[in-house]
UniProtKB/Swiss-Prot annotation:
<dbReference type="InterPro" id="IPR003016">
    <property type="entry name" value="2-oxoA_DH_lipoyl-BS"/>
</dbReference>
<feature type="domain" description="Lipoyl-binding">
    <location>
        <begin position="22"/>
        <end position="104"/>
    </location>
</feature>
<comment type="function">
    <text>The glycine cleavage system catalyzes the degradation of glycine. The H protein shuttles the methylamine group of glycine from the P protein to the T protein.</text>
</comment>
<protein>
    <recommendedName>
        <fullName>Glycine cleavage system H protein</fullName>
    </recommendedName>
</protein>
<dbReference type="GO" id="GO:0005960">
    <property type="term" value="C:glycine cleavage complex"/>
</dbReference>
<comment type="subunit">
    <text>The glycine cleavage system is composed of four proteins: P, T, L and H.</text>
</comment>
<dbReference type="InterPro" id="IPR033753">
    <property type="entry name" value="GCV_H/Fam206"/>
</dbReference>
<feature type="modified residue" description="N6-lipoyllysine">
    <location>
        <position position="63"/>
    </location>
</feature>
<dbReference type="Pfam" id="PF01597">
    <property type="entry name" value="GCV_H"/>
</dbReference>
<keyword id="KW-0450">Lipoyl</keyword>
<dbReference type="InterPro" id="IPR017453">
    <property type="entry name" value="GCV_H_sub"/>
</dbReference>
<dbReference type="InterPro" id="IPR000089">
    <property type="entry name" value="Biotin_lipoyl"/>
</dbReference>
<dbReference type="InterPro" id="IPR011053">
    <property type="entry name" value="Single_hybrid_motif"/>
</dbReference>
<dbReference type="InterPro" id="IPR002930">
    <property type="entry name" value="GCV_H"/>
</dbReference>
<comment type="similarity">
    <text>Belongs to the GcvH family.</text>
</comment>
<dbReference type="GO" id="GO:0019464">
    <property type="term" value="P:glycine decarboxylation via glycine cleavage system"/>
</dbReference>
<dbReference type="GO" id="GO:0005737">
    <property type="term" value="C:cytoplasm"/>
</dbReference>
């Protein structure tokens, strides 16, 4: 499993990349592997304010539907619209083109409560 060192991780298998008060969120390589072929992604719209652990969307795979949880609180500033037509990108590139949302962080220090790559590798 791929677990980049520059990201934060949650127990629910979401990742967070923080840059200048904003963050990008997606699901981990482990999560996409466990889900199998992803066939549909539904995300909350831009402008939605959510708290840490709130649901920001769902992914539907051939064998299950899984809810997506906010790793930190914030306001959605962008969604990956490519996933509407090509949800399989999440399977192909979960840390790159398969990103899901970008957020403006409500409390940037919340990210420090999440796991680093080494701790996440122990969970998976």
């Amino acid at each position: 499993m791929d677990t980049p060192d520059d990201l934060y991780y949650t127990d629910d298998h979401e990742w967070l990349r923080v840059e200048n008060g904003t963050a990008t969120v997606g699901i981990t390589d482990f999560a996409q592997s466990e889900l199998g072929d992803i066939v549909f992604v539904e995300l909350e719209p831009e402008g939605t304010k959510l708290g840490q652990d709130d649901i920001f969307g769902t992914v539907e795979a051939v064998k299950t539907v899984s809810e997506l949880y906010m790793p930190v609180g914030g306001t959605i500033t962008a969604i990956n619209t490519e996933l509407e037509l090509s949800p399989e990108v999440v399977n192909e590139d979960p840390y790159g083109d398969g990103w899901m949302i970008e957020i403006e962080l409500a409390a940037p220090d919340e990210a420090e409560e999440l796991m680093g790559a080494d701790a996440y590798a122990e969970v998976t």
